[in-house]
């Protein structure tokens, strides 16, 4: 089971799950490859976003059985789930907290806090330089070199106090459907500089049929080119007049005047 060792003891009291979005490790499958994640242009046919997608237990809307990531209260850790803007566009992070149809927010386990780090990539080295990709001609805009280390250090300290001392942590800070901070990409308000050259492409998602031996976590993939049986509506954070995600935590670099 998740977070249980061979002596039936809890392994981790707390975890910081970073830059995952809704994607899970491709593990506990025959011939699995734990380092694989699906992107817009590679690894399309792996079961990394199939149910469950939330920490709390809920009923699978397609197969009608309950499942969740945290389902063993005696062994469940405290979790800080941190995503950046990249995870909403690439790793379908909206599905961690909202329905597959993009119509409603889900409440979350009391053992979980979720945070969006606004305007950032997954991670960057301190003092890294922006670039336009390979040969400086791969990307229209320069890459994002925002460093999030200081903010992550503060969050990790808060998680440690929760685990070690029992002090209640920060409330979750992430975009939601109900307050219109989580929206469809096609309806975003964007600054004119970005809007003129932006194609609003994001990584799609859907429940896929890998064969009967994948259902109920049995772990054998029979259909190597699976059929999408139900598409998901992937949403993204609404942005302000500067193009920064509204409902997230801003680093000191974003808060400084230029």
Locate the predicted segments by residue.
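C-terminal His-loop and adjacent cap/lid subdomain of alpha/beta-hydrolase
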Residues: 1-258
């Amino acid at each position: 089971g998740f977070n249980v060792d061979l002596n039936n003891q809890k392994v981790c009291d707390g975890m910081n799950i970073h830059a995952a979005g809704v994607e899970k490790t491709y593990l506990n499958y025959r011939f699995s490859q734990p380092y694989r994640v699906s992107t817009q242009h590679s690894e399309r046919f792996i079961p990394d976003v199939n149910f469950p997608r939330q920490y709390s237990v809920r009923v699978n809307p397609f197969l009608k059985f309950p499942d969740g990531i945290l389902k063993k209260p005696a062994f469940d850790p405290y979790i800080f789930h941190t995503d950046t803007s990249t995870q909403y566009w690439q790793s379908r992070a909206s599905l961690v907290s909202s329905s597959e149809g993009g119509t409603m927010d889900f409440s979350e386990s009391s053992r979980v806090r979720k945070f969006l780090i606004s305007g950032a990539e997954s991670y960057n080295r301190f003092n890294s330089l922006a670039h336009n990709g390979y040969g400086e001609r791969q990307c229209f805009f320069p890459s994002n070199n925002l460093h999030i280390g200081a903010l992550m250090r503060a969050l990790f300290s808060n998680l440690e106090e929760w685990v070690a001392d029992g002090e209640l942590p920060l409330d979750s800070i992430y975009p939601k459907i109900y307050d219109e901070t989580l929206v469809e990409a096609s309806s975003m308000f964007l600054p004119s500089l970005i809007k003129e050259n932006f194609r609003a492409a994001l990584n799609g998602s859907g429940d896929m049929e890998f064969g009967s031996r994948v259902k109920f976590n049995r772990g054998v993939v029979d259909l190597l080119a699976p059929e999408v049986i139900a598409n998901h509506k992937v949403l993204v954070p609404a942005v302000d007049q500067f193009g920064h995600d509204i409902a997230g935590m801003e680093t000191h670099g974003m808060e400084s005047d230029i």
